[in-house]
């Protein structure tokens, strides 16, 4: 089914386990399914929360609205930084894309059209996921095997597009901004997630591009508030120009 944003569908909301972390916590997937013939394009929602907070419920009003327009929206829990630092949550996102490619048809989703939405720190995760879909650090969590002891399906984590709201495209710049504004909680969130601290460079989308790493380029839509004093518009504009170069 081609996507028509002016369409209106009733939706059904359900939840299923995504996977269990090394610490024993079950990460859940919250599925917003349009009622209609489909199959519907799939959108994976990666929540914000400065890598340390929030869960699959964070963007529920938006998820419901998008699903009612004809998208199969799947919002997931991710490993939070106090449980495990970078790259754990990127591994969760990579796993979720592969999991959706295998399972989306169960909810009338078109597994050939998987896009990603990320808000704030979720946008940072989305950028890394999209730019490095086959990175062995990110795809380290295997899919479960098929029925009857069959091997897990062979799919990758490439995505069709990424839409983001105020993504942390340069986490070092946001950390420095927090230092300048004396925002201790935000500073601490960075320190917990980027452990060891040098990982703030390795996992920095702006620096990845400046290092001319070999990355996968997919369409990015970035929505950035002009008065945002958390993710500065000028920093975002620099990232966009670098990504387009």
Q: What residue spans do the PLM features occupy?
A:
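Mobile cap/lid helix-loop segments that gate and shape the active-site cleft of serine hydrolases
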Residues: 5-8, 131-149, 155-157, 167, ...
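Short beta-strand element of the alpha/beta-hydrolase
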Residues: 29, 39-49
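Alpha/beta-hydrolase active-site loop
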Residues: 84-105
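Conserved alpha/beta-hydrolase "acid-adjacent" motif
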Residues: 229-238
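Short beta-strand/loop motif that positions the catalytic acidic residue
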Residues: 216, 222-224, 228
């Amino acid at each position: 089914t081609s996507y028509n944003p002016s369409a209106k569908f009733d939706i059904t909301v359900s939840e299923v386990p995504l996977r269990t972390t090394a610490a024993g916590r079950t990460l859940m997937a919250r599925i917003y399914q349009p009622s209609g013939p489909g199959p519907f394009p799939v959108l994976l929602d990666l929540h914000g929360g400065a890598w340390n907070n929030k869960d699959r419920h964070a963007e529920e009003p938006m998820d419901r609205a998008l699903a009612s327009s004809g998208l199969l929206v799947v919002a997931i829990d991710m490993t939070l930084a106090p449980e495990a630092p970078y790259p754990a949550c990127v591994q969760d996102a990579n796993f979720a894309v592969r999991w959706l490619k295998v399972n989306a048809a169960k909810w009338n989703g078109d597994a050939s059209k998987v896009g990603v939405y990320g808000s704030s720190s979720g946008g940072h995760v989305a950028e890394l996921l999209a730019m490095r879909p086959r990175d062995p650090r990110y795809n380290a969590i295997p899919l479960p095997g098929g029925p009857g002891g069959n091997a897990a399906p062979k799919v990758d984590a490439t995505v069709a597009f990424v839409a983001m709201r105020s993504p942390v495209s340069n986490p070092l710049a946001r950390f420095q901004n927090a230092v300048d504004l004396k925002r201790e909680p935000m500073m601490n969130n960075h320190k917990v997630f980027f452990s060891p601290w040098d990982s703030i460079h390795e996992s920095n989308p702006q620096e990845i591009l400046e290092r001319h790493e070999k990355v996968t380029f997919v369409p990015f839509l970035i929505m950035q508030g002009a008065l945002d004093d958390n993710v500065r518009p000028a920093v975002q504009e620099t990232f966009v120009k670098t990504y387009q170069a």
